[in-house]
């Protein structure tokens, strides 16, 4: 397992437990393991109850954190992938298709970063091209045609900023998705599972409900990008994070996010199964409520929610 810098003391204890586990078991060894396990639990509770915003960002990028492809088979069944935007190509930074959630059909769409070097290149580190947003929109319109809910998973450092992407209409593709998603006639639930950065996240992030995993973040720009603009150096990222209000808890307070999905102690990377179960329960609960509304009720509530963002009062 990979450890972050603030987890060094936890690593020491877990290394000791692992070492003792390989020793011939006797009462003394067993007692020592129990003692260390209790100490580890208490230390983890203490550590993760007072994380800084920057530490949350670090957890959201943890190299062992579950990505969309890891969670997909743990949450949904009968997944049938659909490819291409029918205009240019098939962007593998986003994966989508038909699936079942608790035996009910849904259209599921998610950004995929890739785990190793080969897959990271294949999936372009989760940075979508215009054809990716158009593919996602094609699947959403298909879901609307067959009256299926849409569930999207957000995990991206941002939309791909390359010249070719701009030439193919990156900004238009994202803007088109914002427009179309705000008016879809089926329930739309969006979940941030890792990084939710800038327009790259918004392109599949407009819906009836926005959920976030506990240790994910949602921002208009990455902390490093913000620090580079304000302080001319990315090294100030940990400082600017505190004033960006990008963590799940803070965004829930600001009513940007509707629900925070709890993660296992230590983060989602420590228990994929529990993380997937928590997501499945949260999404199923949201879809149940949304499915009981009429199209008019859903769209009216969605409109009111979107129009409430960015309002302020002068003191």
Curated annotation (Swiss-Prot):
Residue span(s) of domain CoA carboxyltransferase C-terminal: 35-289
Location in the cell: Cytoplasm
Keyword Protein biosynthesis attached: no
Enzyme Commission number(s): 2.1.3.15
Chief place of localization: cytoplasm
Residue ranges the record marks as coiled coil: none
InterPro entries, per the entry: Acetyl_CoA_COase_a_su, ClpP/crotonase-like_dom_sf, COA_CT_C
UniProt superkingdom: Bacteria
Entry's Gene Ontology cellular component terms: acetyl-CoA carboxylase complex
Pfam families linked: ACCA
GO MF annotation terms: acetyl-CoA carboxylase activity; ATP binding; carboxyl- or carbamoyltransferase activity
Record's catalysed reaction(s): N(6)-carboxybiotinyl-L-lysyl-[protein] + acetyl-CoA = N(6)-biotinyl-L-lysyl-[protein] + malonyl-CoA
HAMAP family found in the cross-reference section: AcetylCoA_CT_alpha (MF_00823)
Function: Component of the acetyl coenzyme A carboxylase (ACC) complex. First, biotin carboxylase catalyzes the carboxylation of biotin on its carrier protein (BCCP) and then the CO(2) group is transferred by the carboxyltransferase to acetyl-CoA to form malonyl-CoA.
Stated family: Belongs to the AccA family.
Assembly with partners or alone: Acetyl-CoA carboxylase is a heterohexamer composed of biotin carboxyl carrier protein (AccB), biotin carboxylase (AccC) and two subunits each of ACCase subunit alpha (AccA) and ACCase subunit beta (AccD).
Protein name: Acetyl-coenzyme A carboxylase carboxyl transferase subunit alpha
Gene name linked to the record: accA
